[in-house]
From Swiss-Prot:
EC number, UniProt record: 4.2.1.8
Protein name: Mannonate dehydratase 1
A GO molecular-function annotation: mannonate dehydratase activity
One Pfam family cited in the UniProt record for this chain: UxuA
UniProt pathway annotation: Carbohydrate metabolism; pentose and glucuronate interconversion
Length: 365
């Protein structure tokens, strides 16, 4: 597996490239042009500037997260073709800079949802938290105001230019069903996958976070079954998945290791993180350690190892520890700890494989 690390750019992240390069085994930066609104073409010169910055510190920029999709595409409006053409030009520009994977999502309005950005744990750390009952009772606009109280860093999917149109967007999605959303995703993929394939880029959709409908908005990327359906919409290696163990793991019924075995050749990018799910449906993000959450991180890494996974992996959201001031979920310390935990499992599996091979050779002798 190729270890990468998400970075929000110069002046937009508490973590520096110099710090990231000190984490063992990190070879690339997961990045985006976060100031570019959804639907706009990414200028090649801006892409190349990020490449220059990262390469100065020894990193590649082969994974982009995310090239956000304009809501008109998700809504299936007549204007979607204009935005799809811009998206295709962005794919072409990214290919010119050496990008290999584009992570994106097809979630209406909100890219992800939490009710608390700094929920305190018994050990004194804080983490992203989802209170199931609260989502069913709170006004979505009140939740937006609550999230907006933390202006230190813009949260992906919660950009001010997106949230200022919240009322209009909720009205627009009022009659959009899950099947409508599937149809609109199919339309989008049929038009961009040929471009991605020609450019040598793999599109990797991110599961919905959390993996169920929120505020009456449809969600469709929620399970192994939905991943299978997505891959059949356009059955091509360029149409893939960003398998996120934290997003899918919020539903304990999702068997993530089984998904890895089923779709291994269509997973170019993996997010590995843990969550602790409570009986009432609440969940909190934990350390990456298997014992600390509900998700079997050891089993997931083993599944990647068994399938010969050679794609990109990043530690996903971390806790906020040691008084670090950072973008919620995206500090340095806990994600660095997560990387070392993942490497520990991976190296152990490599050692087991080597020992087994030696044993077989000695038996033949």
């Amino acid at each position: 597996m190729k270890m990468v690390f998400r970075w929000y750019g110069e002046g937009n992240d508490s973590v520096t490239l110099e710090q990231i390069r000190q984490i063992p085994g990190v070879e690339g930066i997961v990045w985006a042009l976060h100031h570019q609104p959804p639907g706009e073409e990414w200028p090649l010169e801006e892409i190349l500037e990020v490449k220059r910055q990262c390469e100065q510190h020894g990193f590649h920029i082969e994974v982009v997260e995310s090239v956000n999709i304009h809501e008109d595409i998700k809504l299936g409006l007549p204007t979607r073709d204009l935005y799809i053409e811009k998206y295709k030009r962005t794919i072409e520009n990214l290919a010119k800079a050496g990008v290999k994977v584009i992570c994106y999502n097809f979630m209406p309005v909100f890219d992800w949802l939490r009710t608390d950005l700094y929920k305190k744990a018994p050990d004194g750390s804080t983490a992203l938290f989802y209170e199931h009952a609260k989502v069913h009772t709170i006004d979505p606009f009140a939740l937006v105001d609550q999230i907006a109280k933390h202006p230190e860093f813009t949260m992906p999917g919660w950009e001010p230019e997106r949230l200022e149109h919240l009322t209009r967007l909720f009205e627009a999605y009022q009659n959009v069903t899950e099947e409508d959303l599937w149809s609109h995703l199919h339309y989008f993929l049929e038009r961009i996958i040929p471009t991605a394939a020609r450019c040598g880029i793999k599109m990797a959709i991110h599961p919905d976070d959390p993996p169920w409908p929120v505020f009456g908005l449809p969600r469709i990327m929620t399970s192994g079954e939905s991943i299978g359906r997505l891959l059949q919409l356009v059955d091509h290696p360029a149409n893939g998945v960003t398998l996120c163990s934290g997003s899918l793991g919020a539903n304990p019924e999702n068997d993530i290791s089984a998904m890895i075995h089923a779709y291994a050749d269509r997973i170019p990018f993996a997010h590995i993180r843990n969550v602790k799910v409570y009986e009432n449906g609440d969940f909190i993000e934990t350390s990456h350690r298997t014992k600390d959450g509900t998700v079997d991180i050891c089993g997931i890494v083993k599944a990647y190892h068994e399938t010969g996974f050679s794609g990109y992996v990043r530690p996903d959201h971390g806790r906020h520890i040691w008084d670090e001031k950072c973008r919620p979920g995206y500090g340095l310390y806990d994600r660095a700890l997560g990387i070392m935990y993942l490497w520990g499992i991976w190296d152990s599996l490599n050692r087991e494989k080597q020992e087994a091979s030696k044993c077989l050779k000695s038996m033949k002798i």
